[in-house]
């Protein structure tokens, strides 16, 4: 895949950070694609399926060859309750369910979502082999893993056959307040694994908007970043 330097993270379409106007959300996706963004990342977990549903509506008028689509398996939710299921069967079922919500007949990149919530042995021995089988059938194009903890990503890469994991997605570790991912760039690149740097603004930490209550940053850092944002605004 030849992806644009900036991609469209569709978690916001699920109202993850704040409530959304669906029409404006759809317009935002269209503007992004028209502006050259060709990689879209989503998950059934975002908004408990809402993000995929809204994204599916937005993609109805976008030619399929204009974008690469990435979604995930493992994390879900219903009626405000978060759930996790990294079993092979649930992973396979989830892929087909996502395709239906998104209105597509294949997924360019399928990720195992936030592997820290699973037994890593299950990820390596059950979840990923199921997704690799879908890759071999042409249902998905590529297979990846995501997590906040870089060490978990490395562990899985070290415990699966070469070529199993084609991409990793890590968030909040390659931004102004945290550059831990830099220490691992060579490791992944030497293994031919693509790197997706998610949340370059640290999920709102480095913005005027501020962070939601569930943000993992310690309160002193939240307050320091808020002061920094106010300082930058004051300086124009």
Give each language-model segment a name.
Residues 1-67:
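N-terminal binding-site loop/beta-alpha segment at the start of enzyme catalytic domains
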């Amino acid at each position: 895949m030849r992806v644009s330097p900036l991609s469209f993270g569709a978690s916001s379409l699920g109202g993850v950070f704040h409530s959304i106007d669906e029409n404006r959300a759809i317009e935002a996706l269209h503007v992004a694609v028209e502006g050259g963004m060709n990689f879209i990342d989503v998950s059934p977990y975002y908004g408990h399926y809402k993000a995929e549903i809204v994204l599916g509506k937005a993609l109805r008028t976008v030619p399929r060859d204009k974008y690469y689509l990435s979604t995930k398996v493992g994390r879900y939710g219903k009626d405000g309750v978060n759930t996790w299921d990294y079993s092979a069967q649930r992973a396979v079922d989830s892929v087909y369910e996502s395709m239906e919500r998104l209105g597509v007949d294949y997924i360019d990149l399928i990720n195992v979502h936030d592997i820290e919530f699973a037994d890593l042995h299950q990820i390596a021995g059950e979840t990923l082999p199921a997704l690799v089988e879908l890759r071999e059938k042409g249902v998905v194009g590529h297979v990846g893993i995501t997590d906040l903890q870089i060490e978990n990503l490395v562990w899985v890469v070290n415990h699966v056959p070469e070529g199993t994991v084609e991409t990793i997605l890590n968030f909040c570790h390659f931004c102004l307040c945290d550059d831990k991912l830099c220490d691992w760039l060579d490791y992944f690149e030497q293994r031919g694994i693509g790197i997706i740097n998610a949340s370059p603004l640290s999920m709102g930490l480095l913005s005027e908007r501020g962070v939601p209550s569930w943000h993992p940053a310690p309160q002193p850092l939240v307050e320091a970043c808020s002061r920094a944002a106010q300082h930058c605004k004051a300086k124009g």
